[in-house]
Amino acid sequence: MKKLAYFLTAMMLVGCSREFVESIYDINYEPTNRFAKNLAQLPGQFEKDTMALDALINSFSGNIEKRWGSREIKVAGKSNYVKYIDNYLSRSEVDFQKGTIIVETVSPTDPKLHLKNAIITTLLTPDDPAHVDLFSSKSIKLEGRPFLYQQVVDQDNKPIQWSWRANQFADYLIANKLKVKDVDFKKAYYVEIPLVENQVEIRGYKYADIVRRASRKYDIPEDLIYAIIKTESSFNPYAVSWANAYGLMQVVPKTAGRDVFKLVKKRSGEPSPEYLFNPENNIDAGTAYFYILKNRYLKDVEHPLTLEYTMISAYNGGTGGVLNTFNRYDRKRAMRDINSLQPNQVFWALTNKHPKAEARRYLEKVTNYKKDFNSGKT
């Protein structure tokens, strides 16, 4: 998975515009972002990483461009799943925010057969990110309960768990929903499949036991954990981001992950991407980082609601960003200022004056999702 970090870096360095990065990853690309902070902490690492850029671009984005053209490069993100198969001729994209699946192929021979295989693969992809390589065209071993089980229904309004039903639905889609478009001087055959209306809730319910255990273990409210997961990944365990963050709670190995290992797990090193793609590990690590924020970095915040607001903001933009909102030069003065204000005043400052636009939006999103959770919505 080191290739992922190199690839996303490469995309930003070799032609992807600021607007492209912002639109794909929903961030405001500022010098203070988490990715830049990671590089600053590892001054020799960036130079080392860039040595592999050309090879990685040729092996991944180069293969995509060769098949699909430069305007049709799609990669997995925080709230979308993208998987290539069939030597990059076929792919699927699940957009969890839009609630749609697009499965398509540019195979020059037997395109309907290739499309059918891609549809079946998409519908039966297992609910285990460890078995799916998002950054190659390797095939997927279709076993176990599908990741999209109950999030998609067939023409008879039935969930799809078994091969025979996936085959039947694929035939139906190709016979009734097939579309064709031009892609880089070739034809792309595709179908669009809607996710069910409550797809977010279905994914969220899968992690209820894990969230409950993490909440009790670290004394962090369940509604806050759910709100963070929904904000970070839309309950997508395959989530990856430009900031080298992984999984449901988008844990960055070199920062939050390293802190959790050192301060909570009492072990050296940092979690691997494979470790963080495991939902239980990821939720445990993300919640443990909230424990660190609460009991170490922000332990001097006095009001419980103010503490929650500052924790949420710090999870996205760092403790330094929170303190800089109130005083850029004196951290002790910043803490005194925070404690002199009412929680609603702190909330206003963090959503209007925080140095990072992404962090300003983040606090609003999380608090809104918390309200949804407590009103019966996931």
What do these predicted regions represent?
Residues 2-9:
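Sec-dependent signal peptide recognition
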Residues 199-202, 273-283, 357-358:
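Active-site metal-coordination segments of metallo-dependent hydrolases
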Residues 219-240, 251-252, 286-287, 311-316, ...:
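Short, functionally critical alpha-helical segments immediately adjacent to catalytic or ligand/cofactor-binding
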Residues 233-242, 258, 317-329:
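Secretory-pathway/luminal and periplasmic proteins that interact with or process carbohydrate-rich
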Residues 242-269, 284-292, 340-341, 366:
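Substrate-binding/active-site groove segments that recognize
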Residues 261-272, 299-304, 333, 337-338:
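Short helix-coil transition/hinge motifs at the ends and kinks of transmembrane helices
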Residues 282-331:
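Catalytic and binding regions of secreted/periplasmic enzymes and modules that target cell-wall glycans
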